[in-house]
Amino acid sequence: VELIQVFTSLAEKINQDPTGISHLNDVYQLEVTSGTYQVRFADGKAEWAEGNKWEPTCSLQIKDEDLLKLVTGKLGATTAVMMGKLKVKGSIEAALRLQKVLKYYAS
């Protein structure tokens, strides 16, 4: 599954250089075509899980292929929201923080 590889490599990249997440304490629930995943930034480290392991700060609804574009910097979050490709529930501020993290670590 391509998303699992993306989550794993993103977490490894972030944990090698946690500068971009050092100030965060958020859980993002990603409701995608293939299922539900969570990404957590806490105590200067990143981790991810399938399902609902933690209480989410915000939830993002997006298709798998659009999430891949978002994570790789090929699709901006603002554009995705305006095009109806990304729906945010919960803290908009947390969603904006995630956008900054993705931009910081985009490869």
Q: What does each model-found stretch correspond to?
A:
Residues 1-107:
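Feature captures hydrophobic
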